[in-house]
Amino acid sequence: MHKYRNVDGVLIACVDFTDPEIRELIESDIPIVSIDYVFNNRLAVSSDNVKGIRDLLTYIYEQGHRKVAYIYGHSSAVTDARIKSFYKTAAELGMEVNEDYLIKGSYRDAQGAEKLTAKLLDMKERPTCIIYPDDLCAMGGRNEIRSRGLRIPEDISIAGYDGISITQQIEPQITTIYQDTRMIGRVAAENLINLIEKPKSSLIEHVVVEGNLIRGRSVRKMEA
């Protein structure tokens, strides 16, 4: 902890939140704001993962898809929120969830996503649409699909999550949820400054920043 002795506050993002050093930091008296990870005693800022998955799955459903696969990321508060939202939204839509279509993967692992996509494509009754944990994974899935001579979205539809610029520049443009990372960073920084300057009046809360659905062209409109 000596490395943080002279700092006024710490913004934590894109780390292994289970790391002992991170846990020790969280339990210290240093003002801390975490991004996309919720601790009981710390202020957290994240995108609205519940609404994001709800909007994404609802759009896919409205395009006529009923066999929807979801490759989700490693265990975390973000993943838990997304999975619960997936099940809840499916129930509200009256869409049956095939448990074989829900597969655990990892965030930002394109190669891993390729292998999991292959597993889904090899199923006797394969899904008509695959949702990936992020856009990088969607790109990996896209590679596997194209390597088999299949077309997106004519043969199979895909959707990502993040809204990174490259997925909006390729054809077909990837359907995804745009996360306003700049806004998330700004809100996190503002809250950290408040924690440092006004510790007695700063609330320990979970601040949520909404994202937006980018419809793209990677989800096919199914024929009735």
Regions picked out by a protein language model, each given a short descriptive name:
Residues M1-T18:
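Central regulatory/effector-binding core of bacterial HTH transcription factors
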Residues G9, P20, E24-A224:
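Bacterial carbohydrate/catabolite-sensing allosteric modules
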